[in-house]
A protein has these predicted regions:
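Aromatic-rich peripheral "rim/lid" segments of glycoside hydrolase catalytic domains that contact
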Residues: 71-81, 87-91, 95, 99, ...
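A solvent-exposed, charged loop/short amphipathic helix patch at secondary-structure junctions
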Residues: 14-36
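Short, hydrophobic/amphipathic alpha-helical packing segments
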Residues: 43-50, 86-94
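Single conserved hydrophobic/aromatic residue that forms the stacking wall/gate
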Residues: 1-12
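C-terminal substrate/ligand-recognition segments
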Residues: 34-70
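A cross-family glycoside hydrolase active-site/sugar-binding cleft signature
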Residues: 6, 64, 112
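Extracellular glycan-modifying ectodomains
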Residues: 30-31, 68-69, 83
Length: 160
């Protein structure tokens, strides 16, 4: 709790239950939405998580490193069409807006990463960025999500 109260904690929604030997993981049903890294897609966590932090600690907060990995690629038109990322962000930001309207003092939101980068867990395999990086050449291509997110930022969420 102390690290959370200092703004250093992560809030994740995990499904656990009490077993005879203590907490145990609950398998999600087949078809449960997940990212390319097999992390659950649970937009509601950006509604209840900030509200919980607000109710418990009464502190302003920033949301950092929210995003997902996708199997991004350059299409024949030379662009990166990452509709999964746009859908993910729209769902999460809608829920964050609900949390703010319910009283969470969220001062800012930061997408996981501007650029595709080296992920400590999986190297260059996962792509989290709003901008595609061709690691061989260093070339950068803004993904569709970069343009979408730019519009969201310019309208303070009004375009979601």
């Amino acid at each position: 709790d102390r690290s959370v109260s200092r703004g250093l904690g992560d809030v994740y929604k995990r499904q656990v239950q009490m077993g005879t030997n203590g907490p145990c993981y609950v398998e999600r049903p087949a078809g449960y939405a997940h990212t390319a890294m097999n992390w659950p897609v649970e937009p509601e966590s950006l509604n209840w998580g900030p509200r919980y932090i607000q109710e418990r600690y009464g502190l302003p907060m920033f949301i950092a490193e929210n995003g997902l990995s996708c199997t991004d690629k350059i299409y024949r038109d030379g662009k990166v069409h990452d509709v999964e990322r746009i859908d993910f962000l729209a769902r999460y930001l809608e829920k964050l807006s609900e949390g703010i309207q319910a009283g969470a003092d969220v001062r800012g939101y930061f997408h996981w990463s501007l650029l595709d980068n080296y992920e400590w867990h999986s190297g260059y395999r996962e792509r989290f960025g709003l901008v595609y990086v061709d690691y061989a050449s260093g070339r950068r291509i803004p993904k569709d999500s970069a343009f979408w997110y730019g519009e969201v930022a310019a309208t303070n969420g009004g375009s979601i």
